[in-house]
Amino acid sequence: MSRIGNKVIVLPAGVELANNDNVVTVKGPKGELTREFSKDIEIRVEGTEVTLHRPNDSKEMKTIHGTTRALLNNMVVGVSEGFKKELEMRGVGYRAQLQGSKLVLAVGKSHPDEVEAPEGITFELPNPTTIVVSGISKEVVGQTAAYVRSLRSPEPYKGKGIRYIGEFVRRKEGKTGK
């Protein structure tokens, strides 16, 4: 039994949910998100509560049920509160700059890396070594942050690179000399 799928989604004040043949549009103070869901799952909107129902208890239906509920809840949270991921840069001379909506990273290469912000994503730099990726879509925020991190992943010997704030990087011992 999918416990996540059975939870009720409560719509906060200022958030509207429209279901048109399982193409769900969620509007809120931060923006609007639209996504198409499986036609097997029935989405019911009753006032400020949204419930999801599946036709049977097969394994496939249980997985789709829980996933649909989680994606729908992420849409509601995104348009009401938004999502953000914070990254930090460690290394001598590693720094970031903003040029319009473009993020320019100096991460020890012969050239600076430039990252164009996808639609709906904003970059913020509280200081030159901290990057905040924010937006209303949890999926796009996570993908963008993962791409920025992949430009210089933390290496295990000195720990240099771009990492999520709070991420543990396993360190290795170097070679021992004679």
From Swiss-Prot:
- As given in the record, the signal peptide range reads none
According to its record, what are the GO cellular component terms? cytosolic large ribosomal subunit
Q: Does the keyword RNA-binding apply?
A: yes
Q: Name one GO biological process term.
A: cytoplasmic translation
Under InterPro entries, the record lists:
Ribosomal_uL6-like, Ribosomal_uL6-like_a/b-dom_sf, Ribosomal_uL6_a/b-dom, Ribosomal_uL6_bac-type, Ribosomal_uL6_CS
- What's a Gene Ontology MF term here? rRNA binding
Q: What does this protein do?
A: This protein binds to the 23S rRNA, and is important in its secondary structure. It is located near the subunit interface in the base of the L7/L12 stalk, and near the tRNA binding site of the peptidyltransferase center.
Which family is annotated?
Belongs to the universal ribosomal protein uL6 family.
- Family matches, as PANTHER family: 60S/50S RIBOSOMAL PROTEIN L6/L9, LARGE RIBOSOMAL SUBUNIT PROTEIN UL6M
Q: Which NCBIfam families match?
A: L6_bact
The entry describes its oligomerization and partners as:
Part of the 50S ribosomal subunit.
Give the protein name, as stated in the record.
Large ribosomal subunit protein uL6
**Species of the source:** Streptococcus pneumoniae (strain 70585)
